[in-house]
Amino acid sequence: MTRIGFMSDLHLDSNQFGHFELTTLKEVLKKERIDHLHIAGDLSNDLAHISLPFIEDLRQELPTSFNLGNHDMLGLSEQEISGYDFQVQQFGQTKLVSFSGWYDYSFVPEKSKEEHLRTKNNFWFDRRLDRELDDPSLTAHSLLRLEKLLASLDGPIIIAMHF
């Protein structure tokens, strides 16, 4: 049986994740006999220069996959973001479906759309992203894609997402 490890939100750049932390992570993964590592987003604010080299380094030790988080999307086009979404990997009969996901504010219905947008624009990192749709539309689009994909798959399914 394959042992899959899951983690997210390393924020390699802002947490100053260096050689010691990387070595420690590799040792823990080996000690726990992890066969495959999946990182569910927010590796860094720089996918090309920080996150992808980090993934390649980990892949020297064990198979590693990832999906984007909101921080990983900085500077990416919608097409680039979409290219990382809805990856399917097979582990025996079990499939791992990974995608970034998004939010539509439905967990806080007492706030108006305007209040949510004001909070986002004042505090959230996501205000720096150049997305083509508003948040509820992004969520709806993502859910449609997920429903279609799930309908085409059989057997046990693990879903990994950032949000």
Q: How does the language model describe each region?
A:
Residues 1-61, 73-75:
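N-terminal active-site segment of His-dependent metallophosphoesterases
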Residues 6-8, 37-42, 64-70, 83-86, ...:
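Active-site neighborhood of phospho(di)ester-bond hydrolases with catalytic His/Asp-centered motifs
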Residues 26-30, 78-93, 144-155:
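Short amphipathic alpha-helices and their capping/turn segments at secondary-structure boundaries
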Residues 47, 74-76, 96, 104-107:
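Short catalytic/ligand-binding loop motif for oxyanion handling, primarily in non-cytosolic enzymes
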Residues 56-58, 63-66, 91-97:
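Conserved beta-sheet core of the metallophosphoesterase superfamily
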